[in-house]
């Protein structure tokens, strides 16, 4: 018994030393509330500088609002935004961009709503460890976003009407010493396929023999969440779907190709499985800290869904590159619309982002792709 206790004590001491060593060389993203912190908390906000109650900004069409323009070293820890706009789909028409250390191309570029998991262009409540939408229409991000020299955050109004009121509070830690060497930078990238192009429209059910017999090992026609070059790790994805065809949209598998591999070393068994549900989500919405489906639509043309998954248990690491994808239907037989934002950390510089689709292209619209139920698709 004494020997067992000593062994257990040795294990505890070893773990403590390992943790202490880790903490000395990594950013303090976890707070020990019993210890004095080594940062100064700062905030930039839309608060009325006069002390009156006009605590918002307006954004004219075609204008850019700078939310943050701060020197480092620092780490953004929380973003809160709420918007009042009369324009339909303003969540698709406002674009969030974040630039680190005076870079000329953004490390974050996405429609405002999509960044916060509202890829359908409509508000709905949901909650996770990293992103949430509170009542009413309150957008929150808790991603840690370090910067060594400088951080600049902007929102562009690419719509046709003025944003009547744009409120924001951004909290960040200001450090007196440089960030640790090798610190990875936060990135987020929007992509869409409106529509995905399935290899056939001649099918009636997802399980038709000609569909099930089709094989896909190289993932060349998969929907792409992310193509990134450099060293880093993939943290997760939010995705929304507008169905152009009847039936369950989520027969496609997730496939991750790491460091240029020809065949994915990480491959899944179905879309709802990747998002940690099962059996078409049972037709019921749900959201938890790391995964969920806040919107589960009818399995028909015109149906809408929103899903998310965060890999905080084990981010997907890469040393040279990552190609993160998902099939659209089994072996890519379906032609639904996908809208997504991938979130990851990596060394700079990052690879060029795809050109952001135009405002008109970002608005959800059903597409004439053929297949079951396609003629019944209606504008959302």
Model-found features: residue ranges?
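N-terminal secretory signal peptides that target proteins for export/translocation
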Residues: 1-5
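Bacterial N-terminal signal peptides
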Residues: 7-20
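Beta-strand-centric surfaces of beta-sandwich/beta-rich domains
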Residues: 24-380
